[in-house]
Amino acid sequence: MKKNEFAVVLASDNRGILPLSVTVFSLLNTAGPETFYKIYVLSDGIDGENGASVERLAAPFDCRLEFIDVSGILEEHDFPHTEQWPVPAWGRVFIPELLKEERGNILYLDIDVLVCRDLTELFRTNMDGKAVGVVFENFSRPGSHFNERLEMPLTCTGYFNSGVLLMNVDVFRERNLVRAVLDYA
């Protein structure tokens, strides 16, 4: 029986190995019998021991796990990388270019996400020509204290969670959206 193959991208460095491991395990442990995840980890210097620990965690599952070094990807761009936004986090911008062999929907997950069930239904979401599917944050409601923290006007309703992104990489490529994001940044 042919399994449904889905690409999932996460991003981490050595400091994030524990939450990365939890997210990977929760993803694989909830996968249905017909689901095969291709997991790509955008890495900024994950050392051999830490990478091997994630590989051992994934080994009992029917999946593919690949680390992609993105440590040099921002050298030509003037992106600010901070503790909150390290190099691997910026890597999500480059997913359509980094994973040229992938087509259709790819799921990006932050490493603080706990997966509670098989994601086949999510991957089969009809994106209807849209480049990205997002979940709007409830905190962006007018009057929320997060509006002040985010320095957004009280009428702002457009803040979304960038830690869960369903990306249609075909649309990104057709519309050259990576270049558009780079030009905007």
Regions found by a protein language model. Give the residues of each.
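Glycosyltransferase catalytic domains, chiefly GT-A lineage
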Residues: 1-185
